[in-house]
Amino acid sequence: MEVDEEKPQIIAENPNENVIRERNAEIVSGGNVFYNPVQEFNRDLSIAALNVYRQRLTKERSEKALKKQRKKVKEQEDEKTTPVPEDPPVYEAGTRYEDGLRILEALAATGLRSIRYAQEIAGVRQIVANDLSRQAVASINTNIRHNKVEELIEPSHSDAMTLMYLSTQPEKRFDAVDLDPYGCPNRFLDGAMQCLVDGGLLLVTATDMAVLAGNAPEACYVKYGSVPLRMKCCHEMALRILLHCIESHANRYGKYIEPLLSISADFYIRIFVRVYVGQAQCKLSMSKQSWIYQCTGCETFTLQPLGITKPNPTAGNPQQLKFGIPTGPAVNSQCEHCGHRHHLGGPIWSAPIHNPEFVQDLLTAVQETTLQSLGTQRRIVGVLSMVQEELQDVPLYYTPDKLCCVLKLEIVPMLKFRSAILHAGYRVSYSHASKNSLKTNAPPAVLWDILRSWSKRHPVNPERMIPGSPLAAILSKECTAVYEFDELHPEANPKSRKSALSRFQENPTPHWGPGTRATIMIGDNKLPKSYRNQNKKQRHKASEQQAEDDQQDTPQAVDEYDGDVEHLPKQPKLEATA
């Protein structure tokens, strides 16, 4: 598979220093500050999102000003004066604007992200590049001067949480806060919620995917307040767990979130949300969260919302809603498909995780503006195209390989499976989080019925029909409908697949991952882990043995010997053995 990532250029000026080039930014790094080149896609996507956010924010402010002007004219009863909308201002990247965005990068490290923001985002007033490490702040200062962006970037040496708590006054708040920590971002969310303006943009990265994917549910509950389940859709579940965590922090201050874009890529997840103030909207948060039941046998999942809303129109408020608590549980004590019991996980965010209008604006900007020269532009287009095709009202997904594994069946080809679902009258899509995903509004009973129909063509070995197994329980039932596998549905093959877009790319380098703290992960300064750990135990034992030999060969009292034989340490007597 073709890889479209452009590798950063590295110029070694001395043994302890590298100059890293990414787009127009140059970073001087001596190996003491964290830099990870694999997150270029993350940085490119963030730059594109902030540019689109600034455009939308400018439009919203213009509309708000026009509405205020019309109200003022109406109060004055001046019919001759008609407010004329002003043309939106034109911004250029690299120039300071007093009415521009104020951005905080709370964990800046080398300052690469902030420098790229200053160079590539149009309409910026100030970027605060903060880090707790003195070495990192020194590196930020060096890199700011090296790239000549002193006018736009203000370095800050402070604890990220302290800085955000000290920025809660209206005049000190930020339009956008970028949190890209090493691991879990939960401890920074509380401060971020308080230092954002109304309608501000929060950009959050989480790299502790092992925790979010269900390997340590107890740790995930401590960090995110949610219990994950080990499922094939674990990457989308990770997105929904993080959104649930962000929403819970927002609700404490009478705020709520609107997810614009939620991406699972490589070894991390990246979320873009707008944070608004509104007590009435906060009440809807309960209905946006759900528990999830997962069968321990066939792994069928069912969602149980925490709250429900019903229309309750009145003369004064036709849009009024009534809030209620749903009845439950949503499943029986035993699975209706295979008879096994259930695991309970969550709560997770069960509302849409993308804003289709924002995604469309972002896709247009990446294809038609100066953003089309981004290093990972081709991959961004592919991922956003898949996001557009996703079913926004269907949380989580199945995978054909896992469904067929439960029934010990030959795997149904993806296009045939999608076609059968579409012919049955349901909707289906991929998820950007997995190339084998099957996101559909078809109930699980229909999916198992399709596989029962498939088993007629590809029978299961009778020896595997063990009583009490999910396989035997599901295949013992008769098919309730006839499903079409041979005639391909016109919508079975999505546009992103037909266009051969870069949807899922292979790892471009060995040991593609989050890297380690405070070190440069490129060049010859650091050997690959596989080489460093070769014969590690043998080398450790050899060094210990050498240390013992050196200790035995060295007399302990030689330094105290003054020439008198009587002062020499006595040698132990050797006993003769028979």
UniProtKB/Swiss-Prot annotation:
GO MF entries: tRNA (guanine(26)-N2)-dimethyltransferase activity; tRNA binding
Pfam families attached to this UniProt entry: TRM
Family designation: Belongs to the class I-like SAM-binding methyltransferase superfamily. Trm1 family.
Region (Disordered): 63-92, 491-578
InterPro entries: SAM-dependent_MTases_sf, Trm1, tRNA_met_Trm1_C
Positions that bind Zn(2+): 295, 298, 335, 338
PROSITE patterns: SAM_MT_TRM1 (PS51626)
Gene transcribed to yield this protein: Trm1
Lineage: superkingdom: Eukaryota
Biological-process GO terms, alphabetical: tRNA N2-guanine methylation
Biased composition (Basic and acidic residues): 564-578
Domain Trm1 methyltransferase as annotated: residue spans: 18-451
Disulfide bonds: none
UniProtKB keywords: Metal-binding, Methyltransferase, RNA-binding, S-adenosyl-L-methionine, Transferase, tRNA processing, tRNA-binding, Zinc
Enzyme Commission number(s) of this protein: 2.1.1.216
Protein name (Swiss-Prot/TrEMBL): tRNA (guanine(26)-N(2))-dimethyltransferase
Chain sites annotated for binding S-adenosyl-L-methionine: 43, 113, 131
Annotated function: Dimethylates a single guanine residue at position 26 of most tRNAs using S-adenosyl-L-methionine as donor of the methyl groups.
Cellular component aspect of the GO annotation: mitochondrion; nucleus
